[in-house]
Amino acid sequence: MANIKSAKKRAVQSEKRRQHNASRRSMMRTYIKKVYAAVASGDKEAAQKAFNDMQPIVDRQATKGLIHKNKAARHKANLQAQIKAM
């Protein structure tokens, strides 16, 4: 454990940030899973609606630095291709 005051503060801040990021990452993954589930069920309209709900969430997390912008683009491209192929 840290002994210096600033190190203790950084440890507290780091833990808060870790929990916040974990929450956001979990939310984003849930939205992505909803799209995959809709694609698996074969309902194109539900899949497109789920994709439209997921897209701004993923973009926002990429903008804030939670994930890389290329990862966000890859998720969107793969899911959109699956929806289009239905």
UniProtKB/Swiss-Prot annotation:
Purpose: Binds directly to 16S ribosomal RNA.
Family according to the record: Belongs to the bacterial ribosomal protein bS20 family.
Protein name: Small ribosomal subunit protein bS20
Short name of any one Pfam family annotated for the protein: Ribosomal_S20p
Coiled-coil residue windows: none
Species per Swiss-Prot/TrEMBL record: Proteus mirabilis (strain HI4320)
Compositionally biased spans, kind Basic residues: 1-27
GO BP field: translation
NCBIfam families reported for this sequence: S20
Region (Disordered): 1-28
Gene behind the chain: rpsT
UniProt GO cellular component terms: cytosol; small ribosomal subunit
Keyword Ribosomal protein in annotation: yes
Keywords: Ribonucleoprotein, Ribosomal protein, RNA-binding, rRNA-binding
